Design a protein with these regions (language model features):
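Class I SAM-dependent methyltransferase SAM-binding "motif I" and its flanking Rossmann-like core
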Residues: 101-160
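Class I S-adenosyl-L-methionine
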Residues: 1-124
Length: 160
């Protein structure tokens, strides 16, 4: 267990990038390696999620725990994951919750973190930003995303 023991743990949302393990940042690699527990969201207990797959390739010696977050029962599954996280925090653990892209943009992590904060106001929650898919796509295409006074807006496809 890390030095967090006895003082309350910390939940760290770790962005693992858009899918290529080589696009995990050094800070993300360190956060995963230094965690007491690494949690990876999945749609089912026996299904390897994309974030888990990336971490397995980048950090093959790290033990990963799958946490199920199902779209049809999202609220109930988020509650279950949040309860597991709170138990880890109460035990003083450093928990890394890995997610595709960036943990603060359209991420399962942000939903889980919000629920954890409801259950444990004042819980220590940190994020490690990750490279997002649009950044990788622009790099592959050799396209500049924006320059100078141009603006960028992120809009979910769910908006219709």
């Amino acid at each position: 267990m890390t030095e967090q023991a006895g003082r309350g743990g910390v939940l760290v949302g770790v962005g693992v990038g858009p899918g290529d393990p080589e696009l995990m940042t050094l800070r993300a690699l360190r956060a995963v390696r230094e965690a007491d527990r690494v949690l990876a969201p999945s749609s089912a207990v026996d299904a390897v999620g994309r974030a888990e797959s990336i971490v397995r390739q980048a950090c093959p010696d790290v033990r990963i725990e799958r946490v199920v977050v199902t779209m049809g029962r999202a609220e109930a599954s988020v509650d279950a994951v949040a309860a597991e996280v709170v138990a880890g925090l109460d035990a003083g653990q450093r928990l890394a919750f890995v997610t595709l892209g960036d943990p603060n943009v359209y991420s399962t992590f942000s939903t889980v973190a919000a629920r954890v904060r409801e259950l444990r106001p004042g819980a220590r929650v940190e994020t490690v930003p990750g490279i997002m898919a649009f950044q990788e796509l622009a790099a592959r295409a050799g396209t500049v995303v924006l320059q100078h006074a141009e603006r960028l807006a992120l809009v979910t496809a769910l908006d219709g």
